[in-house]
């Protein structure tokens, strides 16, 4: 991407397309004020104070036609999100009016922004680093308040600060090692340098490994738990799904095989987003459509983070029940004995001891499912510690793992008695890898790819 294109004036609709109370068309760049003024009838936007909202009308400069009655926000560089002049035109919501204003601005000299380009400019102008830019999208995509809390902390710079501090410490260590090698003042300088490198490398490794330990929790809160609801036909899987969702999404009848495919929905369980997959009942069937659903159910079971196995407590165990118990035994599984409001006939002695008796009809013990999920995945600890920094982004996790591997190579080399100057290479590589997280050492291709995943207008 050319420098000219990076820093021309861009525009986009920043609110979702469709009907709504308010629509926002955003401008950013050197000519933002002049372009906005060319279609605005009201105060002179190039003379108003920064961070003010100004009433007026958007007009077509060629015909003089009024397009809409608007409020225009003016924010002057550098105290803006992009650190450029920014104008936001607040219109009445609607596809026609926002698109008409957008086309006017483009005709007056603005360029249509690419996905994520406003945030990309904030990054290029030093307003945010790469982790903070990614946090913007995480906030937009957050499915629960806990996921949003983690993203907001990242946007606030908690992860950036930790990474930058570690990189600085690594740089200080490399400088000290270099001085000791090039300007030895003591006879035992080699032993001193080796001891320093061992101490600091172990310190860095411990810090990054502690950060990695937050990844499981952070990733779950960011992306959710893929949860398969399995069981033979007509044991109450769809009723359980509807109960958790608190709305009727799945067909509930007394006819076996009414769920003929996989139904997916998200539900918030105490701050954890569960991607609930209601599977077709797993059984032998001659119905071709249902057979396809059964095969998809087996695949969903294999890929799930969590399995909710539903059994009918009012009937004796069947061969299908036993097959599902065996099939799911290596999974993170919660066994639910449904229909406990009826006479119990199931053989409890043939089941593991950790089952939960429930009644979807009466809501009995549904809350215990949430408690068991907390026990399985969070060791009964709180989901988010207020002052903790969490890894939740797969890119960050992968790079931290690579950084730890580089530090392990340094420690292994020290144990083998390798020369310190050779081990500097791996420590330098650790410093570079951590720089990829914040964007200080990230290739242009990666930056372009990351911002292309953003929505238009952000």
UniProtKB/Swiss-Prot annotation:
GO terms for biological process: tRNA methylation; tRNA wobble uridine modification. This is tRNA modification GTPase MnmE. It holds the Pfam family MnmE_helical. Belongs to the TRAFAC class TrmE-Era-EngA-EngB-Septin-like GTPase superfamily. TrmE GTPase family. It is an enzyme of class 3 (hydrolase). GO terms for cellular component: cytosol. It comes from Streptococcus pyogenes serotype M2 (strain MGAS10270). The keyword Nucleotide-binding applies. It is found in: Cytoplasm. The lineage of its organism: Bacteria, Bacillati, Bacillota, Bacilli, Lactobacillales. (6S)-5-formyl-5,6,7,8-tetrahydrofolate binds at residues 26, 88, 127, 458. Binds 1 potassium ion per subunit. K(+) binds at residues 234, 253, 255, 258. InterPro entries: G_TrmE, GTP-bd, GTP-bd_TrmE_N, GTPase_MnmE, MnmE_dom2, MnmE_helical, P-loop_NTPase, Small_GTP-bd. Homodimer. Heterotetramer of two MnmE and two MnmG subunits. The keyword Cytoplasm applies. Mg(2+) binds at residues 238, 259. Its EC number is 3.6.-.-. Residues 224-378 form the TrmE-type G domain. One of its GO terms (molecular function) is GTP binding. CDD domains: trmE, TrmE_N. Its cofactor is K(+). Exhibits a very high intrinsic GTPase hydrolysis rate. Involved in the addition of a carboxymethylaminomethyl (cmnm) group at the wobble position (U34) of certain tRNAs, forming tRNA-cmnm(5)s(2)U34.
């Amino acid at each position: 991407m050319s420098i000219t294109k990076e820093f021309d004036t861009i525009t986009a609709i920043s609110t979702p397309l469709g009907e709504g109370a308010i629509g926002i068309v955003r401008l950013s760049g050197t000519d933002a004020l002049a372009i906005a003024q060319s279609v605005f009838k009201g105060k002179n936007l190039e003379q108003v104070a920064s961070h003010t909202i100004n009433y007026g009308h958007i007009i077509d400069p060629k015909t003089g036609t009024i397009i809409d009655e608007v409020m225009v926000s003016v924010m002057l560089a550098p105290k803006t999100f992009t650190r450029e002049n920014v104008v936001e035109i607040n219109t009445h919501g609607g596809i026609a009016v926002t698109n008409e204003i957008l086309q006017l601005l483009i005709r007056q000299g603005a360029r249509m922004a690419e996905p994520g380009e406003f945030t990309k400019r904030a990054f290029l102008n030093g307003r945010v680093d790469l982790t903070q830019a990614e946090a913007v999208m995480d906030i937009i995509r957050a499915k629960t308040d806990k996921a949003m809390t983690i993203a907001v902390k990242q946007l606030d710079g908690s992860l950036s600060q930790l990474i930058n501090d570690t990189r600085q410490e690594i740089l200080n260590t490399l400088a000290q090692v270099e001085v000791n090698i090039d300007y030895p003042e003591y006879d035992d300088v080699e032993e001193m340098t080796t001891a320093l490198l061992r101490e600091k490398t172990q310190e860095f490794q411990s810090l990054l490994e502690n950060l990695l330990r937050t990844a499981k929790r952070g990733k779950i809160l960011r992306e959710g738990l893929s949860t398969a609801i399995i069981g033979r036909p007509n044991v109450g899987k769809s009723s359980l799904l509807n109960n958790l969702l608190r709305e009727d999404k799945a067909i509930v009848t007394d006819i076996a095989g009414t769920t003929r495919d996989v139904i997916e929905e998200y539900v918030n369980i105490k701050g954890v987003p569960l991607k609930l997959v209601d599977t077709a009942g797993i059984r032998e069937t001659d119905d071709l459509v249902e057979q396809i659903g059964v095969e998809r159910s087996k695949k969903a079971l294999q890929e799930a983070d969590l399995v909710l196995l539903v059994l009918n407590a009012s009937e004796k165990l069947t061969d299908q029940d036993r097959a599902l118990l065996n099939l799911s035994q290596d999974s993170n599984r919660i066994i639910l004995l449904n229909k406990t409001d009826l006479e119990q006939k199931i053989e409890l002695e043939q089941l593991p001891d950790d089952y939960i008796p429930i009644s979807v009809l009466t809501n009995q013990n549904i809350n215990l499912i949430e408690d068991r999920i907390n026990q399985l995945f969070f060791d009964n600890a709180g989901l988010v510690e207020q002052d903790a920094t969490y890894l939740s982004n797969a890119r960050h996790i992968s790079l931290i793992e690579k950084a730890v591997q580089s530090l392990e190579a340094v420690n292994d080399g020290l144990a083998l008695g390798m020369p310190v100057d050779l081990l500097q290479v791996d420590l330098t590589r650790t410093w570079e890898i951590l720089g990829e997280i914040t964007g200080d050492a990230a290739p242009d291709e990666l930056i372009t790819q990351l911002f292309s995943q953003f929505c238009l207008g952000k």
